[in-house]
Amino acid sequence: MNEPTALSELPPVTAWLSDMDGVLVKENRALPGANEFLAALRANNIPFLVLTNNSVFTNRDLSARLANSGLDIPEENIWTSANATAAFLQQQSPGSTAYVIGEAGLTTAIHAAGYVMTETDPEFVVLGEVRSYDFRALTQAIRFIEGGAKFIATNPDVSGPSDEGTLPACGAIAAMITAATGKQPYFVGKQNPVMIRAGLNKIGAHSERAAMVGDRMDTDVRAGVEAGLRTHLVLSGSTAREDVCNYPFRPFGIHEGIGDLIELVEAAH
């Protein structure tokens, strides 16, 4: 197998995208090196985004939650699957209509994209994370899709963690709708590189000079690889070093935690 291109032959990284959970925070606590990594980005005037597939919270909510964890990340530096989904819809069919199942993070983003949320003949059915599942809403979504509405979902994650244990996530509910309609959704969030490319567009960055940091091979690293970024896997989240060989792609670098990347940030300037 060919070795990755030598670091000295690559252009410097001038923009960074980082996953949130398992990279910067874990169980509402900042991970070691997270503050120092963010400080290095700011000190070197490097544009960055913090990414999450969670579509429940608005960017303002997430910024406040991160502040409670000890991290200062303004809402304009946050890019959620809800933001990416709204940007995708705005690009595909500007000013159209959608039947939306989701929380404030998704509905706020859809409104900001100029969409009308409706229960009358929508062009799209858009599914995000929800805290409680409404049988009537799911039934309505199924009937709209059967009637020709296009099925969009924020992210393919089938489960997520909570203080009480595992919770069903967007992908699990999407599977139920698919079982009833025979229609597969188009997932916008990671592992789809669309979310990465839209984030790069937001900060005016190019893939060949950007890096993606994540703790999961199947979403973060895969999306980064497919979008053409240099990917860095950190072992502070859900992936162990021995898991990497189970995938047909590999990250540019593997690190114990986000603090190990500070040197790379500073070396670019």
Residue ranges and their predicted role:
Residues 1-46, 55-79, 86-269:
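Asp-based, Mg2+/Mn2+-dependent phosphohydrolase catalytic module
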